[in-house]
Every structure is written in structure tokens, then in C-alpha cells.
Amino acid sequence: MSQLYRIILGCIFSLLFIVIPAKAQKEAEVYNVDSSLYAYYQRCQENLLEPVVLSMSDTLFHMAAEQNDQRMQAVALSTRLDYYYYQGNNEDSVVFHTSKVKQFAKETLQPKYYYFAWANRLILYYLKTGRSNIALYEAEKMLKEAQEEDNKTGLLYCYNIMSQIYTIKNFDVMASEWRQKEIELTEKYKLENYNISNTYAQLASYYTTHHQPELAVKALEKAVRTANSASHKILAKLAY
């Protein structure tokens, strides 16, 4: 990165707390978070693959603490975990920072971040590095804990990660059963599930492969209807 580029970035960064872009302001209102915190969070995301995000995430954590925003503190800790997760070559750091996120989330009663870190970072890390058996072991521990607590958010993450594990293992029937569990839980309790569209699309693909066209069409219709992003819409259309 050139010196000039660093200077330009520094100038832009210094203006963040003076001029908040309209889009960021609107998104901050939607997510019910202070606009300056949200703007700085966006900067963290822009630098997610760079080592500088480690110090930036610390800053975000302390900024959030000053405003007594425990949710954004959890986001800050998760951002640091994200850096190591996407590096893909530092397992000890992934394990350590997963534990940090889980501990903070448990202490502040934020199951969303607790189970996200466990499922979508630690367990997915094991899957990405070809260790599906270790991933399954962790997922079974997570499932047991979520069941004991009757934590619907935790169960949602468990069902989703179980479907991914069994897909990797080429156990398509079992994978589809876990996807169906995820869908039923989401619909029954009207849970927040940003990627539910992908689950419908994957289930539709299973139905198509197993010559169940009517079920496939219904799942695809729901995939399109619940799409929350352009990538969701693309996956749903590809499943047709």
C-alpha cells in the first residue's frame, strides 16, 4: 500500500465523525445503532482482511463500551475473530477468539453472537480445512447445549451447520432432514434467519435430484420470496 494511499485513507477516516454518509446514517437508524459507531464498523469491514483491523476492532469495542452498547461490543469481538477466520492459517487464534466472543456473549445474554461464533466461525473453519469429523464433534456439543437451554437461536445455528456438515460428508438425506428442521423452526417461531433463502434453495435442489418436482417448486418459490440479498436471489434462480 503506497504512502499516498495511506494518507488519503487517513484523511477519509478523520472525516468519518464529521460527515456521515446518508446511506450509513439510514442503515444506522435501521439497525438502531449510533451513527458514528456504525460508520466506524463499516471502516472495519472495509479493512477486514488487513492486520490493521485488529487495532480497529479494539477501538470499536471501546467506543461501544463508552456508549454502553453491548451488541456493538460483541460485533467488535466478532470482527477480530473474522480476521483470523478469513486468514485461514491460524487455528489457535480462531479457537481463542471464538472463546472470547462466546464468553462475552454469554455474559451479556447475546445468544446470536455466541452461537454464530461457534457454528459459523469455529465449526466452519474445521470444515474449510477438511476436518469434518472434528466439525461434527463440535456441532454435537453445540446442539446438546442449545437443547438443554431450549435456545431457539442456538438450535437454528445447530440445524444449519449440521446440514452443511452432512453435505460435505455426502449424506444428502441427512443434510436435507437438518435443513427441514431449520426451516420448520424458523417458520414456527418466526425467527430471524438472514440466510433462510439459501436453505430453501438447497432443499429445492435436493428435491429436484430425488425427483420430487412439486416440493422443489414450492421450496424455490419460498427461496425467492425470502431472499435478502442479490446473492440469495442468484442462488435461488440457479436452483431452478
Give short role names for the model-derived ranges.
Residues 9-18:
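Bacterial N-terminal signal peptides
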Residues 3-4, 19, 221-222:
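Compositionally biased, low-complexity segments enriched in small residues
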Residues 22-240:
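A "functional boundary" signal
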Residues 1-9:
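Bacterial N-terminal signal peptides that target proteins for export
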